[in-house]
């Protein structure tokens, strides 16, 4: 027969996607079921959380699904997203389920604003594909003077990752002012290394409720 080119389809989640009032100290295990058996590929490189957790969630297979265990104490009144990248693939032909996300909140609501953008190399006028975009709530970090140490002193409130064409969509933003940083993740370790990673900084604050 013809080669299977269709990625897995989600058929069930527990708790549901966009669940609110998740316990910060004892978050539940998350079960996601698919219409076929799946494999988990390149989890260390593909999976990330927004905001970052001190310990990455563990993801294991169970039947036709996966079980996600959160190993960190969560922040109160915070919207979290577990981004799986292309790590979830079908068992037979390794067709990836691109950009799968599981979103939940430890508060009463899920932050729902977003920003789309593009990361580019200012010297070569080309897109930067292996890049992460960090959003810091402006009121929570110092205003830089001579030297900007934000990336080393603070943890981002929202994290996005650019596609191969440099385009990114940052989701689950609040209607507040953000300072935005983008860096090229040369070593695929999801950490900014100033000796090898390029970095760019938006020269103004950004508020998704006031700007497109």
Place the predicted regions along the sequence by residue:
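Acidic, low-complexity Ser/Thr/Gly/Pro-rich repeat segments typical of extracellular/periplasmic
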Residues: 1-172, 177-179, 199
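Structured interaction patches on ligand/partner-binding surfaces of diverse proteins
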Residues: 98-99, 185-212
